[in-house]
Amino acid sequence: MSDQVSLGVVGIGKIARDQHLPAIDAEPGFKLTACASRHAEVTGVRNYRDLRALLAAERELDAVSLCAPPQVRYAQARAALEAGKHVMLEKPPGATLGEVAVLEALARERGLTLFATWHSRCASAVEPAREWLATRAIRAVQVRWKEDVRRWHPGQQWIWEPGGLGVFDPGINALSIVTRILPRELVLREATLIVPSDVQTPIAAELDCADTDGVPVRAEFDWRHGPVEQWEIAVDTADGVLAISRGGAQLSIAGEPVELGPEREYPALYAHFHALIARGESDVDVRPLRLVADAFLFGRRVQTDAFGR
């Protein structure tokens, strides 16, 4: 394989067009060669109706980036790995933890890279927050991740089906940040899932966790919020409150704003994917998904009014 990695993208929907394709175009380590999607095409590359057709035709392809919904990701990722391709997974990495474990083992067996991405971990505030918190006495953590589902997921029925996560689809972004910036592991203690009567996944949720020192970590997720999104994490410490806002684009410490670099979540993901391939390594951290899975396993369910379509 040359230094430039030939790449295929599978699932040309909103996230692929808004984030993946521009990031690939800006990353010199990748050359977009082909795409697969049932209902869309990308100009300037070869297009196929599905991954099977792409893999059959593009024998020299080095890697694939999977952007389809999580319910189909396991079958796609397994097919790509068995075809000898490195694989990058949009979040969440799978519909179940078991799927991801099998994929990780398969990648290791085949000597291939598997990268389970968490784009919010690449937000500008995350690493400065992590470094500052590493030496602080943390007292409590409060997460508020709220938005309007009709604005951010219009017509996306898959989010309401089993494996679609519901409000945890954006909420897992917050959990990916929290599990990155906090110095100790989290354990779920209680959860409440608010589920509309006509769907399978929650429209709102509350999680109460604690780290291994007993520090409380509370998360509130709500898809009925608006018109202004609330994507915030507040960490109370002995040296003041560290506050992340705008989904990780802004940071303040003890009331003072911190100057951050430019936003480059998806470009950073592709740069990391290229580096992983070059080193022959994988990066699969399932802790955010495990917290969500624990909430579904352990949480109390409360039915609410039908969502409608």
From Swiss-Prot:
Record-linked InterPro entries: Gfo/Idh/MocA-like_OxRdtase_N, Gfo/Idh/MocA_oxidrdct_glycsds, NAD(P)-bd_dom_sf
Organism classification: Bacteria, Pseudomonadati, Pseudomonadota, Alphaproteobacteria, Rhodospirillales
The organism's place on the tree of life at top rank: Bacteria
Family membership noted in the UniProt record: Belongs to the Gfo/Idh/MocA family.
Keyword tags: Arabinose catabolism, Carbohydrate metabolism, NAD, NADP, Oxidoreductase
Effects seen without this gene: Cells lacking this gene do not grow on L-arabinose as a sole carbon source but grow on D-galactose, D-xylose or D-glucose at the same growth rate as the wild-type strain.
Protein purpose: Catalyzes the NAD(P)(+)-dependent conversion of L-arabinose to L-arabino-gamma-lactone. Is involved in a degradation pathway of L-arabinose that allows A.brasilense to grow on L-arabinose as a sole carbon source. Prefers NADP(+) to NAD(+) as electron acceptor. Displays high catalytic efficiency for both L-arabinose and D-galactose in vitro. However, the enzyme appears to be involved in the metabolism of L-arabinose but not D-galactose in vivo.
The protein's name in its UniProt record: L-arabinose 1-dehydrogenase (NAD(P)(+))
Catalytic activities: alpha-L-arabinopyanose + NAD(+) = L-arabinono-1,4-lactone + NADH + H(+); alpha-L-arabinopyanose + NADP(+) = L-arabinono-1,4-lactone + NADPH + H(+); D-galactose + NAD(+) = D-galactono-1,4-lactone + NADH + H(+); D-galactose + NADP(+) = D-galactono-1,5-lactone + NADPH + H(+)
